[in-house]
Structure formats: structure tokens, C-alpha cells
């Protein structure tokens, strides 16, 4: 066990392609998606709870959890938080593997990823907690065990743990690497109010639509490293549902393209709008133009997934 704070980076994501098939018996939808990990991130710090005298065997490994940064008040600080659940599952696996009892921890989350914004902020926090707890517990769990825990926590957690550019199938948790050249530059526009992922999926189930499940052209474009070619193949089946629930997103997409973006797309279930740009300068210009009316940021991808700082 360590006696010092461990800080991990929780990278956000954008879906370059999100094809949504039919609902399964378990309530999930069959997905074909291409994820790209972005530099916009949260940070997770795991610290031994020095003043906590309770036994992790009886009370659980997490003593307390706090949240700071963007929209911190909207993030739960109890066991409903995925980061809390990630820590508990890691500790349980550690003990099953014969690991020694550990001192309870405090988890501090500093938010940079928008809450309920379609960029997997909660999943990324869980993934980074897995990385931090692995080090805290002495790395007694294998990578495959950690990925299995990630899949139990949520569909986006395995990708946010691994990062880079990957094809996701099943409910998004079955991942294979995608060859991608170059760095892609994004301008991001955030909405003041989040969108519920289940609500967006319920809406799409009510719509007459044809799923887009072929990513051949996008994968070929990614190999070239040409943002113009990639922009031509960005697609999100959930976008129509998100626009139906939040019609103002259509205006944001139009404004971003008019400001110079190559293409704009609703990120995941929304409401964040992501604009692929030709270069860093254009991304800055698009973000600046949109910042008159919205909160914005710039990001690059692909980047590493969850990792402990300095490792």
C-alpha cells in the first residue's frame, strides 16, 4: 500500500461514429462506434484517509469522496458515484487475489469534463479511479481483471480506461484498436443543461430510422490522417434524438460550421457539440466565435486513456 496521494488523469471521449442498432433483451442497444480519446480531462486523486479508523473490510475502502471544478454540485459524492464503485470493486478483487487489507481512502475529483455532456465524464472518472487504485493496492490485479471490472461499471468505462482510437461493439465495451494517424483538433461547445442518456435512447426507439453500422469509410479516412476526409465521415445515430429533445443544438452546430469547422457533431448522447477543425489555430478561432454565446474549450485527440500522472 502507498502512504501518499496518487493522481490519475481521466480523459474524455468523442464518438467519431455512433451507430445504434436494436434494443437487446437486457435493455442495452447493439452499438458500432469509433471512439477517440480527447485531452479535455478530469483528475482523480486517491489519498489514504489518515483520520479514518474504520476497517475497510467492514466499511468499504472508500471513506469519503469530494468533487470540485466544473458543475461539481451536480456530481454525487456517495456510493452512487461510479468512481466510488470502481474503488470498491478494485479492493474486492485485490482481496480475492490474496492482497493484504488496506487503509481506507479519500477520493477527490476535479472536473474539467462537462457533467451529462456526452463525453463520458463519469465513466472517465471511474476508469481513472481504477488506475489510481491499482497503484494504491500494489498492482495485484491483472489488466484483464481491471478491464472486466470496467465493463461491469459501464459501457464507456473500458474505452476511457484504454483511450486512443478504438472500435467498440456490443454495448461499446468490446474494443479493438483502430489505426489512426496524426492529431485531430476539436472545438467544443457545452450546453448549460445536460441530457440524460437513457432519455435520448428512449427517444431514438420512438423514431423511424435506419441504423448506420458501417465504419469502413471512416476507418480508411483515419489511416490517412487527413481531417478533411475524417470530417466527411463523422456520424451519430443519436444526433436526431438529441436534436429533437434540444432543438437549440441545431443552431450551435450551424454556428460552428459557419465559424470555420470542417464538421460538427453531437458528442455521444449530447448535448456537447464537437467540431473537427483543420488545425489548432482554426479550433481556437471556432471556440472563440462560439464563446460569445456558449462555454467552450479546445481539445486534441487521440490521447492516452486513464493513467497515473508520471507513469
UniProtKB/Swiss-Prot annotation:
This is 4-diphosphocytidyl-2-C-methyl-D-erythritol kinase. One of its GO terms (molecular function) is ATP binding. Gene3D superfamilies: 3.30.230.10, GHMP kinase, C-terminal domain. ATP binds at residues 114-124. Belongs to the GHMP kinase family. IspE subfamily. GO terms for biological process: isopentenyl diphosphate biosynthetic process, methylerythritol 4-phosphate pathway; terpenoid biosynthetic process. Its EC number is 2.7.1.148. Keywords: ATP-binding, Isoprene biosynthesis, Kinase, Nucleotide-binding, Transferase. It catalyses: 4-CDP-2-C-methyl-D-erythritol + ATP = 4-CDP-2-C-methyl-D-erythritol 2-phosphate + ADP + H(+). The keyword DNA-binding does not apply. Pathway: Isoprenoid biosynthesis; isopentenyl diphosphate biosynthesis via DXP pathway; isopentenyl diphosphate from 1-deoxy-D-xylulose 5-phosphate: step 3/6. Catalyzes the phosphorylation of the position 2 hydroxy group of 4-diphosphocytidyl-2C-methyl-D-erythritol. It is an enzyme of class 2 (transferase). Pfam families: GHMP_kinases_C, GHMP_kinases_N. The active site is at residues 13, 156. Disulfide bonds: none annotated.
Amino acid at each position: 500500500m502507498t502512504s501518499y496521494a496518487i493522481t490519475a488523469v481521466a480523459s474524455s471521449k468523442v464518438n467519431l461514429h455512433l451507430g445504434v442498432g436494436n434494443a437487446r433483451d437486457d435493455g442495452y442497444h447493439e452499438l458500432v462506434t469509433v471512439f477517440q480519446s480527447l485531452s479535455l480531462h478530469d483528475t482523480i486523486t486517491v489519498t489514504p484517509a489518515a483520520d479514518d479508523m474504520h476497517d475497510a473490510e467492514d466499511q468499504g475502502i472508500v471513506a469519503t469522496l469530494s468533487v470540485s471544478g466544473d458543475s461539481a454540485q451536480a456530481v454525487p459524492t456517495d456510493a452512487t458515484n461510479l468512481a466510488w464503485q470502481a474503488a470498491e470493486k478494485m479492493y474486492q478483487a485485490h482481496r480475492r487475489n490474496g492482497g493484504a487489507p488496506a487503509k481506507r481512502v479519500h477520493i477527490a475529483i476535479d472536473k474539467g469534463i462537462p457533467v451529462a455532456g456526452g463525453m463520458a465524464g463519469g465513466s472517465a472518472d471511474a476508469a481513472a479511479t481504477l488506475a489510481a487504485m491499482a497503484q494504491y493496492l500494489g498492482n495485484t490485479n491483472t489488466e484483464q481483471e481491471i478491464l472486466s471490472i470496467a465493463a461491469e461499471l459501464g459501457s464507456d468505462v473500458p474505452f476511457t480506461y484504454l483511450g486512443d482510437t478504438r472500435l467498440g461493439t456490443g454495448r461499446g465495451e468490446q474494443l479493438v484498436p483502430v489505426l489512426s494517424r496524426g492529431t485531430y483538433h476539436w472545438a467544443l461547445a457545452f450546453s448549460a443543461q445536460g441530457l440524460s442518456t437513457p432519455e435520448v435512447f428512449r427517444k431514438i426507439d420512438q423514431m423511424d430510422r435506419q441504423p448506420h453500422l458501417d465504419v469502413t469509410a471512416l476507418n480508411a479516412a483515419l489511416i490517412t490522417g487527413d481531417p478533411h476526409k475524417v470530417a466527411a465521415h463523422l456520424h451519430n445515430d443519436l444526433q436526431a434524438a438529441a436534436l429533437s429533445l434540444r432543438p437549440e443544438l441545431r443552431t450551435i452546430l450551424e454556428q460552428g460550421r459557419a465559424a470555420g469547422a470542417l464538421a460538427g457533431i453531437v458528442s455521444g448522447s449530447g448535448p456537447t457539440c464537437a467540431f473537427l477543425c483543420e488545425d489548432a489555430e482554426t479550433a481556437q478561432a471556432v471556440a472563440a466565435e462560439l464563446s460569445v454565446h456558449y462555454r467552450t474549450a479546445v481539445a486534441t485527440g487521440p490521447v492516452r486513456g486513464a493513467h497515473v500522472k508520471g507513469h
